[in-house]
């Protein structure tokens, strides 16, 4: 396998992993620990 093919597959997999983890953090069980600054703000 050529180095460019390996590099493109590695970068694609890394980006998909980061995207999947960020979606899991935003909408999954860890999202209960996130704070909402708009709810904390009082006018």
UniProtKB/Swiss-Prot annotation:
Q: How does it sit in the membrane?
A: Single-pass membrane protein
Locate the transmembrane regions by residue number.
Answer: 5-27
Query: What InterPro entries does the entry give?
Result: PSII_PsbN
Give the record's keywords alphabetically. Cyanelle, Membrane, Plastid, Thylakoid, Transmembrane, Transmembrane helix
**What's one GO-annotated cellular component?**
cyanelle thylakoid membrane
Q: Which domain of life is it from?
A: Eukaryota
**Can you say where in the cell this protein is located?**
Plastid, Cyanelle thylakoid membrane
Q: Which GO terms describe its biological process?
A: photosynthesis
Q: Where primarily located? A: plastid
The entry sums up its family as follows:
Belongs to the PsbN family.
Summarize the protein's role.
Answer: May play a role in photosystem I and II biogenesis.
PANTHER family according to UniProt: PROTEIN PSBN
State the protein's name.
Answer: Protein PsbN
Q: Which organism is it from?
A: Cyanophora paradoxa
């Amino acid at each position: 396998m050529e180095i460019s093919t390996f590099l493109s597959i590695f970068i694609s997999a890394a980006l998909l992993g980061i995207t999947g983890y960020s979606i899991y953090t935003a909408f999954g069980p860890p999202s209960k620990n996130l704070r909402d600054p708009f709810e904390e703000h009082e006018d």
